[in-house]
Regions:
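Short catalytic helix/loop segments, enriched in acidic residues and glycine
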Residues: 21-39, 124, 165-170
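Conserved catalytic or regulatory cores that recognize and/or transform ribose-phosphate-containing ligands
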Residues: 139-262
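Divalent-metal-activated hydrolytic enzyme cores
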Residues: 53-89, 117-144
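Short Gly/Thr/Asp-enriched flexible loops that form oxyanion-binding sites at enzyme active sites
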Residues: 104-131, 223-232
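Mid-chain, well-packed structural core segment of small domains
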Residues: 64-107, 219-243
Length: 262
C-alpha cells in the first residue's frame, strides 16, 4: 500500500523561498506520521518546479514562470515516469498534494492572472492534472486523521457497536480514540479513577482533529452531549452518527443544540 505525494511533504526545502510556515511543517509531519502509523509507503513525485527553475527559486505562478515549451516537455517526461511507477506498482491510494502550488495543488492553484481572472483559481495544479484518474487529497486534509469517538458505552450492544464503528474508521486510516478502551467501561471506580478518566478523555478530545458522536435514542447520552459541546467550543468539527428513527420533535431529530453543533 502506497501513496504518491508532493516531494516537498518529505523535503520542505524544495519549496519556493519564504512560503513555508511552521503550520506547513506541522502538516507535513502529521502526514508522515499517519502514513507510518498505518504502514503506508510514501512515494514522492518528481518536483517539476525544482527541476526546471533550480533550488532557491522565488514564488511565482504558472503563467509567470512555467508557461514555456521547455517546461511542458519536462512535464511530459515526468508524467511518463510516474505512469510507469503506477503501472508497475498498481494504483496508489491517492496523491497527497499541496494546495496553492502551481504544479501540485489539489483544489486550488496559483495558475496566474488572465482575462480578468485572479492568479489563484480552483482546480489541480498543472502537474497533478496529468493524473485525473488518481484521487488527490490536500496535505491539510490528509493530516487530519485523529478521531475521538463519543458514544454511550453502558451496554454490551453499545460497546459492540462502538467497536465496529472504530474498526470501520481504522480501515480508512483514521486513528480512533475509544473511551471504553481507556477503562471507562465499569461502575467500579473511585474518585481518583474518575478524575483520571476525565482528564485522559478531555486531553484526547483536545488532541483530536474531529469528533464522531453517536447520538441514538430520543434523548442523547449526557456524556456524549458534553463531549460534543466541548469539541464545538474548541472549534473542532463534529460529525453526528444516528441510526435511530425516533425524533425529539417535528423539526429536530435530537436536541437542537446537538443537531446544530454537528
Amino acid at each position: 500500500m502506497y501513496v504518491l505525494c508532493s516531494p516537498c511533504v518529505l523535503h520542505p526545502a524544495l519549496r519556493a523561498e519564504g512560503i513555508t510556515k511552521p503550520s506547513d511543517l506541522e502538516l507535513f509531519a502529521k502526514t508522515v506520521k499517519r502514513c507510518a502509523r498505518f504502514g503506508i509507503e510514501m512515494v514522492p513525485l518528481p518536483c517539476p518546479e525544482s527541476l526546471y527553475l533550480g533550488p532557491g527559486r522565488k514564488p511565482g505562478t504558472y503563467l509567470e514562470r512555467l508557461n514555456t515549451l521547455e517546461f511542458s516537455s519536462l512535464m511530459v517526461n515526468l508524467e511518463q515516469e510516474v505512469t510507469a511507477v503506477i503501472r508497475e506498482r498498481g494504483p496508489p491510494l491517492c496523491i497527497i498534494g499541496v494546495n496553492s502550488s502551481p504544479t501540485c495543488g489539489v483544489s486550488s492553484t496559483y495558475y496566474g492572472a488572465e482575462e480578468g481572472r485572479p492568479p489563484k483559481r480552483e482546480g489541480r495544479g498543472v502537474f497533478l492534472s496529468k493524473f485525473p484518474s488518481v484521487p488527490a487529497v490536500d496535505v491539510a486534509v490528509f493530516a487530519r486523521y485523529r478521531v475521538y469517538l463519543a458514544a454511550p458505552l453502558f451496554s454490551e450492544a453499545e460497546r459492540g457497536f462502538n467497536t465496529s464503528i472504530a474498526r470501520f474508521l481504522s480501515t480508512h486510516l483514521f486513528d480512533v480514540h475509544l473511551p471504553q478502551e481507556a477503562g471507562d467501561d465499569s461502575d467500579m471506580r473511585d474518585v481518583r479513577e474518575q478524575e483520571r478518566l476525565f482528564l485522559y478523555n478531555k486531553s484526547a478530545l483536545e488532541d483530536a482533529d474531529f469528533i464522531v458522536a453517536i447520538i441514538e435514542g430520543a434523548d442523547a447520552d449526557s456524556g456524549t452531549a458534553w463531549e460534543m459541546g466541548y469539541a464545538f467550543a474548541l472549534g473542532k468539527p463534529v460529525i453526528a452518527l444516528r441510526t435511530d428513527f425516533r425524533r425529539v420533535g417535528h423539526h429536530e431529530h435530537v436536541n437542537l443544540m446537538l443537531e446544530q453543533s454537528a
